[in-house]
Amino acid sequence: MTSAAAPNTLNRPSIDPEEVEKFSRIAAEWWDPDSKFKPLHKFNPIRLGFMRDTICDHFGLSGERPFEGLRILDIGCGGGLVCEPMARLGAHVTGVDAAEANIKTASVHADEQGLEIDYRHGVAEQLIEQDEAPFDVVLNLEVMEHVANPHTFLVDCARLVKPGGLMICATINRTSKAFALAIVGAEWVMGWLPRGTHRFHKLVKPSQIRTALREGGMSLRAPVGVSYNPLTDQFSLGEDTAVNYMMVAEKPAG
């Protein structure tokens, strides 16, 4: 059972209307592995493995459904590509997205899979205004490069992490290599993503995440790079953070 409740129109500081409209136009394609979201489908297994290992290590969890009892928030959840695996691992999952079309797609797919996910059309600021209880884990995946003000957005997101909890971030670095591969290569040459999906000036450096989340009372681990090998058509984790990377932040328990 899923839910989607919020006004049809959102007017919040973090929202970039052009970005919301961009993803609304292709919302129906989220679960098609050969669609415009094909790169996310290829990237998802390595990302999910990293998140599962990170969360299990942090909370001392194991088993087939190790996330039983955890509350996980996926901000900018899109069509639910991460929410559903988190729910299958036992978590109580809340997914929020500024694009109502994304929430509708995610809700329908979760219902078809028999998964209970709390989907909401909205943004992080609304959860704060509604005094939502903080979450054990907040996922901030491929969304900060699409918001109006990444710094303010990240500080707000930190407020939604409970003491002793985690935030896991994933985004694209603002480097010449990222411009060449993630924008020119992926969008203009290979056509893996619609042209204009990413704008170079909106890409986010690890130092920006570190500054914002430290302001939000969190400590940061070193970034982990995610690289694509065109010969094997596979993504892998490594030290190269010049294009895709992930970062883990912890909020002190005290």
Curated annotation (Swiss-Prot):
Protein keywords: Methyltransferase, S-adenosyl-L-methionine, Transferase, Ubiquinone biosynthesis
GO molecular function per UniProt: 2-polyprenyl-6-hydroxyphenol methylase activity; 3-demethylubiquinol 3-O-methyltransferase activity; polyprenyldihydroxybenzoate methyltransferase activity
Reactions listed under catalytic activity: a 3-demethylubiquinol + S-adenosyl-L-methionine = a ubiquinol + S-adenosyl-L-homocysteine + H(+); a 3-(all-trans-polyprenyl)benzene-1,2-diol + S-adenosyl-L-methionine = a 2-methoxy-6-(all-trans-polyprenyl)phenol + S-adenosyl-L-homocysteine + H(+)
Top-level class of the enzyme under EC nomenclature: transferase
Ligand binding (S-adenosyl-L-methionine): R47, G76, D97, L141
Enzyme Commission code: 2.1.1.222, 2.1.1.64
Matches recorded under CDD domains: AdoMet_MTases (cd02440)
Pathway it works in: Cofactor biosynthesis; ubiquinone biosynthesis
Record SUPFAM superfamilies: S-adenosyl-L-methionine-dependent methyltransferases
InterPro entries: SAM-dependent_MTases_sf, UbiG_MeTrfase
BP term (GO), one: methylation
One Pfam match: Methyltransf_23
Family: Belongs to the methyltransferase superfamily. UbiG/COQ3 family.
Physiological role: O-methyltransferase that catalyzes the 2 O-methylation steps in the ubiquinone biosynthetic pathway.
Protein name: Ubiquinone biosynthesis O-methyltransferase
Biological source species: Maricaulis maris (strain MCS10) (Caulobacter maris)
Annotated gene: ubiG
